[in-house]
Design a protein with these regions (language model features):
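Hydrophobic residues embedded in beta-strands of well-ordered beta-sheets
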Residues: 82-85, 154
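An exposed acidic His-Trp-rich patch
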Residues: 84-141
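Short, solvent-exposed aromatic-acidic interface loops
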Residues: 68, 88-94, 161-165
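Start-of-domain marker
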Residues: 21-74, 78-83
C-alpha cells in the first residue's frame, strides 16, 4: 500500500467520528415560562453556516470535546412570540462567553439577540423523566414542546402531556 492510501485511511479513521457525531452532544438550553428545557436542536448553527466571521469567533476557543463539537452551549429564551439568544457558555468549563465577543454590537439589544436567522422546528421533552431508552440513549419526559419558527418568530408552539402508565 502506498503512502497516499495509508494517509487517506488514517484521515478517514480520524474524521469519521467527527462527521457522525457518535457521542451524544451537550444540549443547548431553552427557557420558556420558567421551565428550563434541554435542546437537541442548535439554532445558532444555521447562522454559523451563513456567517464566516461569527463562525470563526465561535471556533476561537481552547475547548475541544467530543460531546460538544460546536464548542459552545447556547442559552435561548422565548419572549412573547420571538426566539432570543440570551447567553453562550463554553462547553468545557461552562464559563460565560460574552455575546459582544461573538456578535456585532448592533445585534445586541437588552443583552440578547433576536434569532431572525432561524427558521425551523424545535422539538424537546421536559418536566419529569418518565422513561429511558437504551436504544436511543435518551430520556423521555412528561411534557413535549413543539415549536415552529420562521425568521425568529414563533408561528406555532404546542405543549403535549405524555401519559405513560
Amino acid at each position: 500500500m502506498n503512502r497516499f492510501n495509508t494517509l487517506l485511511i488514517l484521515l478517514g479513521l480520524f474524521f469519521i467520528p467527527m462527521i457522525s457525531n457518535g457521542t451524544i452532544q451537550k444540549p443547548d438550553i431553552l427557557i420558556y415560562k420558567g421551565d428550563t428545557i434541554s435542546l437537541k436542536d442548535f439554532p445558532l448553527e444555521l447562522l454559523r453556516e451563513k456567517n464566516s466571521s461569527i463562525s470563526k469567533r465561535l471556533n476561537d476557543t481552547s475547548c475541544l470535546s467530543t460531546d460538544c463539537w460546536r464548542q459552545y452551549i447556547g442559552i435561548w429564551e422565548i419572549e412573547n412570540d420571538s426566539l432570543f439568544l440570551i447567553g453562550l457558555r463554553d462547553c468545557c468549563d461552562y464559563k460565560n462567553i460574552s455575546l459582544k465577543k461573538i456578535f456585532p454590537e448592533q445585534w445586541i439589544k437588552n443583552q440578547k439577540i433576536f434569532a431572525d436567522w432561524y427558521s425551523g422546528k424545535i422539538k424537546a421533552g421536559f418536566s419529569k423523566e418518565i422513561e429511558y431508552s437504551e436504544k436511543y440513549d435518551e430520556f423521555f419526559y412528561k411534557k413535549q414542546i413543539n415549536i415552529c419558527i420562521a425568521n425568529g418568530i414563533i408561528n406555532e408552539l404546542i405543549i403535549k402531556e405524555i401519559d405513560k402508565n
